[in-house]
Amino acid sequence: MDTTIREYQDSWEAEIKSKLEDKFSGKIEVTKTETRRVYAKVLDKADIKEICKFVHDDLSFEHINCLCGVDYPAENKMQVIYEIDNYTFYRGVILELEVDVPYDDLHIETVSDVWGGANWHERETWELFGIVFDHHPRLERLLTPDTYEFFPMRKSYKLREDKR
């Protein structure tokens, strides 16, 4: 991993886009770039680990800021969103990856061995949405009691009626 610190250049987003699309043609689609931001969609959840390893090892994105789930019941899917930061080589540029996870197979590979910080984000996402991160070293609850049998961030989760 290159740890050279460089001053920001407005060509970095295009460079990152090009490297991702060249390496993963047909596996990733860069949907948007703007100053210090690159947005991309991973087309098949089976490719997420390989793409994340490349982003970490070859593009030097060394920190995962956020990993979260989003529920899209009308589309019969959830999404996992990865927000990844680079402090050195592409200093200050954030890469946001999104990947669809269909309701009928809520499994995706862990990236906690790529970025250690993903560990707790994946645990929280599993606990609140029910997305299973395969091969996670410790997929267990953080916030809710062990007796919970539902996932409170899913849109299908119903709050109790106010009976005041």
Residue ranges and their predicted role:
Residues M1-R164:
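Terminal low-complexity/charged segments
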